[in-house]
């Protein structure tokens, strides 16, 4: 199978957040999409090994920050290559608390969306969380960061827990 074909699928790059038991969690994700408009539902797909996955499962809510094209790699790395349980990802980061209590990262974000989980779907290594939007806000008029930009312009790597990770042969 030519795994390069999967790299041709277009994705955005987002920070998915949640809070459980007083601990804020956040991670980079590329699998975020709108499902319906009435009611407005979005889905996020998170690896079961990630702290953010567990926080969403426990709290029943999540936030999504749509990243701008100019997001620095250091900022992406802060949320993409460290566990929330081992590093305070939100120290020094601009964010606000949403209606459900989840942190919404506003720094380098074009928009933020907040949702309450209405359904979960186990897809093996990951869980697809379907959420009904409770709030959304456009923060600035800027180009959004895509997964292709992350790889081509920023020379970003794919973590082992990503939905699009394939082991090298």
Curated annotation (Swiss-Prot):
SMART domains: Flavin_Reduct. It catalyses: 2 a Fe(II)-siderophore + NAD(+) + H(+) = 2 a Fe(III)-siderophore + NADH; 2 a Fe(II)-siderophore + NADP(+) + H(+) = 2 a Fe(III)-siderophore + NADPH. It holds the Pfam family Flavin_Reduct. Coiled coil: none annotated. Optimum temperature is 88 degrees Celsius. FMN binds at residues 27-31, 45-52, 82-84, 89. Its EC number is 1.16.1.10. Keywords: Flavoprotein, FMN, NADP, Nucleotide-binding, Oxidoreductase. SUPFAM superfamilies: FMN-binding split barrel. GO terms for molecular function: ferric-chelate reductase (NADH) activity; ferric-chelate reductase (NADPH) activity; FMN binding; oxidoreductase activity, acting on metal ions, NAD or NADP as acceptor; protein homodimerization activity; riboflavin reductase (NADPH) activity. Its cofactor is FMN; FAD. It comes from the Archaea. NADP(+) binds at residues 7, 126, 147-154. Homodimer. Belongs to the non-flavoprotein flavin reductase family. Catalyzes the reduction of bound ferric iron (Fe(3+)) in a variety of iron chelators (siderophores) using NAD(P)H as the electron donor, resulting in the release of Fe(2+). Not active with uncomplexed Fe(3+). Also reduces FMN and FAD, but not riboflavin. This is Ferric-chelate reductase (NAD(P)H). The lineage of its organism: Archaea, Methanobacteriati, Methanobacteriota, Archaeoglobi, Archaeoglobales.
């Amino acid at each position: 199978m030519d795994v390069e074909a999967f790299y041709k699928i277009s994705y955005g790059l987002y920070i998915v957040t949640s809070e459980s038991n007083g601990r804020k969690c956040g991670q980079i994700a590329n699998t975020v999409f709108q499902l319906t408009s009435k009611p407005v539902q979005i889905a996020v797909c998170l690896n079961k090994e990630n702290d953010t996955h567990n926080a969403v499962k426990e709290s029943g809510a999540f936030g999504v920050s749509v990243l701008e094209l100019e997001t620095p790699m250091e900022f992406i790395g802060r949320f993409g290559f460290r566990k929330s349980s081992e590093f305070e990802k939100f120290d020094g980061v601009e964010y606000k608390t949403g209606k459900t209590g989840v942190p919404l990262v506003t720094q380098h974000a074009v928009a933020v969306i907040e949702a309450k989980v209405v359904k979960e779907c186990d897809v093996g290594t990951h869980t697809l969380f379907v959420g009904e939007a409770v709030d959304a806000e456009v923060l600035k008029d800027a180009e959004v960061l895509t997964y292709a930009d992350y790889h081509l312009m920023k020379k970003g790597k794919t973590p082992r827990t990503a939905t699009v990770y394939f082991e090298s042969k």
